[in-house]
Amino acid sequence: MGTPASGRKRTPVKDRFSAEDEALSNIAREAEARLAAKRAARAEARDIRMRELERQQKEYSLHSFDRKWGQIQKWLEDSERARYSHRSSHHRPYLGVEDALSIRSVGSHRYDMFKDRSSRLSSLNHSYSHSHGMKKRSSDSHKDLLSGLYFDQRNYSSLRHSKPTSAYYTRQSSSLYSDPLATYKSDRASPTANSGLLRSASLASLYNGGLYNPYGPRTPSECSYYSSRISSARSSPGFTNDDTASIVSSDRASRGRRESVVSAADYFSRSNRRGSVVSEVDDISIPDLSSLDEKSDKQYAENYTRPSSRNSASATTPLSGNSSRRGSGDTSSLIDPDTSLSELRDIYDLKDQIQDVEGRYMQGLKELKESLSEVEEKYKKAMVSNAQLDNEKNNLIYQVDTLKDVIEEQEEQMAEFYRENEEKSKELERQKHMCSVLQHKMEELKEGLRQRDELIEEKQRMQQKIDTMTKEVFDLQETLLWKDKKIGALEKQKEYIACLRNERDMLREELADLQETVKTGEKHGLVIIPDGTPNGDVSHEPVAGAITVVSQEAAQVLESAGEGPLDVRLRKLAGEKEELLSQIRKLKLQLEEERQKCSRNDGTVGDLAGLQNGSDLQFIEMQRDANRQISEYKFKLSKAEQDITTLEQSISRLEGQVLRYKTAAENAEKVEDELKAEKRKLQRELRTALDKIEEMEMTNSHLAKRLEKMKANRTALLAQQ
């Protein structure tokens, strides 16, 4: 870790600790807020689940109540059907059509009521399943109508898929239901038939329990109890149809109560075999059991509240009649009064035993209810404590997770800071290298600028020289052109003068010849014909003055002199000649002056001295020298122009290089400034990162200490609990 800059002010330790405490308090407040939100969400979800469970329990209780009511209705129909068949067979062996229709209408009415109730229940279940997306319910809500409160699915499946009823059971049950008095008469006829009746009654009770009992098969004790009740009732002297119905109803009520107790005991034994009772407590509905017990108690109280005096009276008074009727039915056997008294004692003993067994069953049922309520309370307390511990555990886990997340984030930030520091240091090294390279380039550019300035100065000097040379060349060209013009004019004048001289000589000769011919013609009287007249024709025009004959050329010269007499023309020609001569002299003077100027410039003063004599050779040599000098000057001029073009190109190239170097130097300066600013910024960021790292290390140590304290507190709480 690098050292901070010298001019940086470090924050005091107290301020840093206060900032850390504030940060920790902020983190704790945020964690508490998140935890409170989480707890609220959990509480809301728990309330929703409880409401859903209550609703399902209500629906299940309604379903079970309707199912039990349907079973009770079916049982009542069967009992009434059996009672009616018993009465009809005892009193009216043949029924009328109206009675049969009334019985059928009553049964069908009750069946329709049960069917309507079951259809309403199925429609309610169907609508609920569709409204809630056919979600999975518990196994209790999907049981069949044949299943009872504590019905075992295995027994139900075995009952549904197996057919345990045999022909013997069918015959026995049909015989019992169709003609119970016949069995009673046969019982009175012989004591052996009494035992057969007991066996048939026990078998009928077994079959009836297997058919109408939805709570599973009966135990042998229950079968023996039911058979003993029937046998005692049959053997009593005051046995009537009402007593039979009351006994059957009381037997059914006690049987339902015992079946509920036994089914609950079987359920708890099965649940103990499967696992624990607490996990299966939710499958038991206490209100249904209590309602069933209340119903069975009411039925039992209604059936067994008759006074014992009636039983005793009915047992003592018609003993002789019964014995006489039995004796009349079977004359071969006689019943002893001692045996009847012993049988009555046995019957009362059996009744006492039955009441004791029922009392024990009721006591066991109450104890079972109390234990079940205690188990439910313990289960609720355990669930509450478990929920609290779970909440505390989740809170601690959440705090640990948040602290782990904070530590991981700080570690990631540390790694990110280290990586950024390395990247910035590498970038700084690259920028330093680029700065050194740019400094070297800048030095080269400065050297190029210096060379450019030198070249510009040299170019300016050359340009001045070229300007002076071009001016001189231009002047020389002008002078040469002017001299060429003058020379051409002088040559023309010279030729013209030579022509004039020749013409003058010719004219003089012709004049002399003419004078001689005139003299001779005057002497002889002849006329000279000019040469230009063809065929010897003579012009008949009148000639003013004397007659003169001249040549063709002389005539042209005279015509060019103008009109007038020959003397006037000759005087004109003589004046023009003098003028031409004066012009020639002037031109010669000017030529000499120009030659003197040229001789001063080229140092050829001595060469022009011979021109005064008018020699043509010297003039030709001078002309050649002038032409040679002109060609040399032209060559120098073309060379100078080429040098000028090359220099201009090099100047433009150097100017472009200078511009590029200037832009590069400016960019380098900008980059250097940016690099310096970036370096300062990186140094500041490095210092802030180091400060943050130190603060994070201190906060990390504080958080680790707090985490250790929380772990110690948690272990202490767990040890206390």
From Swiss-Prot:
Disulfide bonding pattern of the chain: none
Modified residues (Phosphothreonine): T331
Outcome of swapping S202A: Reduction in LPS-induced NFKB activity
Region (DVL3-binding) residue spans: 1-370
Positions where Phosphoserine occurs in the chain: S18, S190, S202, S309, S312, S320, S324, S328, S332, S333
MF GO annotations: LRR domain binding
Residue ranges, annotated region (Disordered): 232-262, 295-338
Keyword terms: Coiled coil, Phosphoprotein, Wnt signaling pathway
A Pfam entry, by short name: LRRFIP
Tissues where the protein occurs: Widely expressed, with highest levels in heart and skeletal muscle.
Function: May function as activator of the canonical Wnt signaling pathway, in association with DVL3, upstream of CTNNB1/beta-catenin. Positively regulates Toll-like receptor (TLR) signaling in response to agonist probably by competing with the negative FLII regulator for MYD88-binding.
Family the entry assigns: Belongs to the LRRFIP family.
Quaternary state and interactors: Interacts (via N-terminus) with DVL3. Interacts with FLII. Weakly interacts with MYD88 in resting cells. Following LPS-stimulation, the interaction with MYD88 is rapidly enhanced; the complex gradually dissociates to basal levels after 6 hours of stimulation. Interaction with MYD88 is regulated by LPS-induced phosphorylation at Ser-202. In the presence of LPS, competes with FLII for MYD88-binding.
Name of the protein described by the UniProt record: Leucine-rich repeat flightless-interacting protein 2
Organism of this sequence: Homo sapiens
